[in-house]
């Protein structure tokens, strides 16, 4: 994400010495206008300008569409409100709870949901939801956002996620709850032609232009690029962010090089346009207060107050600790690791690079079904393979699986795959990513998927080549 933003936002650098603006004279008319009551700061003025520009662009495009393409124009609108959709979420939650087994993990998840429900009517502002992997963060954050929106008559929920793998998973859950006609996916891997209903397909295509949908799931790049863009196509959607809830999932993945302008933008949107922001992750970054750098320009001016939804006494990290990391200081060769993996019928092996994954994959025996996962695969192939893995794990069918992703981006963090080590079938599933990140997901649904050898101690491995 950081590289993409650098390429797009820093393509034309502007030196401070090149700018000659008399701020008092330039904004004297604005200061004397009714807008002065909003106390817009100089640093935030460009967000107000861009928001007004968004209103103008969308109104102009819609009027033109009504004149030039009335059939498309008629397909817009007639959308459900969040108030209309809330009963569907309640029904889904109730059904989920009634069918859930009485386990420790499920009791903790219910506790988290109840806490989110209790705090949802709080005033608009910045909130954080810190829940370890497996604690039901996705549904709990959705419940909080929905009830918060209903309490404050807010327009829509926008969920921004760093990785398309998680977006596909989250959007699938949301469509299951609310129906595909109420959930908009907006990212590079989404193909509107996958929507079977023609009316819903056409509405989704049109909605990507201005985000006129009750629930939007998009990427961080799409969101923040639009907030700082000067292009009509990017800015057109911005006015529909006003009076909305912005859920930033896996917030620790925000690029540090752009953290200050991102935080400044969020503060501006909260103050001027009435949004609420929910930061969700298992490991919250420090986004509040003032962090002094080596010089004044390096100071980080964070958000003044972020309210954590889950109190410390819940001790969720202790209660949900499911994996004990035992660092193996002894280097292993690919052949040794492959031989160890081959001893078990169903194994998840996490390695660190694509090269490691390929070397290990080539050394695994062919006495089963081999499956390969990579972030280099095209989206259709990737989703097909993930679906096959889930089916094999669910049905207990023999499989010999290997998957890998970009080790530097952690593209599989937050992705849900459930299985267990002991099995009568031969299933070996290897994934290349951060061992520490992925080990947190190895018992997300009450089943063990271990990193090295099928034991209950995950051991990130070092290869000697």
Model-derived regions, located:
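Interdomain hinge/linker at the junction between the two RecA-like core domains of SF2 helicases
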Residues: 283-343
């Amino acid at each position: 994400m950081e590289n993409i933003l650098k390429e797009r936002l820093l393509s034309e650098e502007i030196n401070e010495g090149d700018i000659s603006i008399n701020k008092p004279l330039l904004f004297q008319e604005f200061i004397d206008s009714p807008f002065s009551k909003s106390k817009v700061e100089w640093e935030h003025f460009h967000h107000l300008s861009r928001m007004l520009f968004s209103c103008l662009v969308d109104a102009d495009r819609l009027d033109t569409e009504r004149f030039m393409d009335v059939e498309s124009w008629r397909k817009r609108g007639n959308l459900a409100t969040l108030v209309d959709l809330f009963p569907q979420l309640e029904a889904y939650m109730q059904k989920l709870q009634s069918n859930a087994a009485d386990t420790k993990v499920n009791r903790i998840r219910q506790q988290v949901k109840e806490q989110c429900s209790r705090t949802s009517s709080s005033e608009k502002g910045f909130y954080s939801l810190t829940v370890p992997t497996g604690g039901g963060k996705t549904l709990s954050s959705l419940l909080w956002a929905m009830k918060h929106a209903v309490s404050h008559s807010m327009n829509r929920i926008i969920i921004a996620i760093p990785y398309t793998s998680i977006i596909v998973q989250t959007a699938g859950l949301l469509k299951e709850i609310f129906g595909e006609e109420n959930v908009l996916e907006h990212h590079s891997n989404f193909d509107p032609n996958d929507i079977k209903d023609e009316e819903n397909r056409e509405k989704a295509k049109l909605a990507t232009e201005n985000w006129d949908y009750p629930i939007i799931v998009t990427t961080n790049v799409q969101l923040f690029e639009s907030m700082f863009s000067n292009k009509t196509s990017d800015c057109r959607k911005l006015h529909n962010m006003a009076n909305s809830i912005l859920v930033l999932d896996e917030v620790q993945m925000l690029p540090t090089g752009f953290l200050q302008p991102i935080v400044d933008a969020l503060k501006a949107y909260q103050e001027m346009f009435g949004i609420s922001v929910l930061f969700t992750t298992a490991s919250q970054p420090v986004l509040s207060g003032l962090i002094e750098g080596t010089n004044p320009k390096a100071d980080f001016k964070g958000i003044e107050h972020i309210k954590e939804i889950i109190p410390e006494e819940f001790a969720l990290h202790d209660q949900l600790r499911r994996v004990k990391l035992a660092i193996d200081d002894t280097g292993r060769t690919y052949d040794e690791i492959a031989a160890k993996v081959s001893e078990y019928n169903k194994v998840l092996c996490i390695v660190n690079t694509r090269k490691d994954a390929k070397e290990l994959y080539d050394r695994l025996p062919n006495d089963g079904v081999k499956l390969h996962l990579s972030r280099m695969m095209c989206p259709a192939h990737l989703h097909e393979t993930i679906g096959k893995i889930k089916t094999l794990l669910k049905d207990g069918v023999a499989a010999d699986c290997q998957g890998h992703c970009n080790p530097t981006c952690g593209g599989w963090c937050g992705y849900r795959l459930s299985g267990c080590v002991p099995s009568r079938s031969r299933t070996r599933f290897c994934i290349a990513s951060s061992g520490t990140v992925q080990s947190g997901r190895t018992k997300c649904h009450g089943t063990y998927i271990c990193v090295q050898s099928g034991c209950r101690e995950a051991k990130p491995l070092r290869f000697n080549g």
